Amino acid sequence: MRVVLLGPPGAGKGTQALKIAKEFDIPHISTGDIFRQNLRDNTELGKLAKEYMDKGLLVPDEVTNRIVEDRLEKEDCKKGFLLDGYPRNIPQAEELDKFLEERGHSLTAVINIQVEREALIDRITGRRVCPVCGATYHIKTSPPKVDNVCDKCGSELIQRSDDKLESVVKRLEVYEKETKPLIDYYTKKGILVNIDGNKSIDEVFEDIKKALLGDRRDDIH
């Protein structure tokens, strides 16, 4: 099973990715994680990526493709994988198709988790984290016992700069601009499945499972 997972910030993509990987016994490949791994291990590809990052430049598709493909060549990906954070544009999507085709494979499905914009903003801006022990809270859905104080260590909670309204709106705009062409691309290929991400975590996961196990309607509500 070879799956790409799409979804805006705040859609619960990370949570669903872990559940999918466990359920179908396939590796969850997050591009952020493999980039960090290559940088940590000081690999040739890591060094190449770092040259661009140190200059404040975007890592070119060619380097990103190689980093992802290097990971997909590993033994644990032989029976499938779940890609999260890649592809991000049409050239990357075309390269992934070519890479898989050369090995006699193709994508099983592209899962697109959809959540209403206001709900996304609410989910993200409500997050609070403990800068000391790393515990996470949400002011509406999982607040601390004492307002703005960590239950575990008593430290004052903070809102990360990424979770502030202005930053969230910008991140969503970037995501929408980046992802719309991809959604069109995979829709034309007949492998995109839209999942209603406004439901509970378990309900969303059940819908994803249905899609991956053969209930391949364009949208699952």
Curated annotation (Swiss-Prot):
Catalyzes the reversible transfer of the terminal phosphate group between ATP and AMP. Plays an important role in cellular energy homeostasis and in adenine nucleotide metabolism. PROSITE patterns: ADENYLATE_KINASE (PS00113). The keyword DNA-binding does not apply. NCBIfam families: adk, PRK00279.1-2, PRK00279.1-3, PRK14527.1. Its main location: cytoplasm. This is Adenylate kinase. The lineage of its organism: Bacteria, Bacillati, Bacillota, Clostridia, Thermoanaerobacterales. Residues 126-163 are annotated as: LID. One of its GO terms (biological process) is AMP salvage. It catalyses: AMP + ATP = 2 ADP. Keywords: ATP-binding, Cytoplasm, Kinase, Metal-binding, Nucleotide biosynthesis, Nucleotide-binding, Transferase, Zinc. It is found in: Cytoplasm. The gene is adk. Pathway: Purine metabolism; AMP biosynthesis via salvage pathway; AMP from ADP: step 1/1. It comes from Caldanaerobacter subterraneus subsp. tengcongensis (strain DSM 15242 / JCM 11007 / NBRC 100824 / MB4) (Thermoanaerobacter tengcongensis).
